[in-house]
From Swiss-Prot:
Coiled coil, from the record: none
Protein name in UniProt: Large ribosomal subunit protein bL34
Family matches, as PANTHER family: LARGE RIBOSOMAL SUBUNIT PROTEIN BL34M, MITOCHONDRIAL RIBOSOMAL PROTEIN 34 FAMILY MEMBER
Entry-linked InterPro entries: Ribosomal_bL34, Ribosomal_bL34_CS
GO biological processes: translation
Species this protein is from: Mycobacteroides abscessus (strain ATCC 19977 / DSM 44196 / CCUG 20993 / CIP 104536 / JCM 13569 / NCTC 13031 / TMC 1543 / L948)
Gene name linked to the record: rpmH
Amino acid sequence: MAKGKRTFQPNNRRRARTHGFRLRMRTRAGRAIIAGRRRKGRRELTA
């Protein structure tokens, strides 16, 4: 029985572009996420 390939192939640029700060700030929902994390006092807001 063959196993599937490992699906997590780390890539910092892709990580930032998909989950980064600038992407979050683009939409109203994204800004809400940032605001919630600021309210909670998260040390890191985004990837």
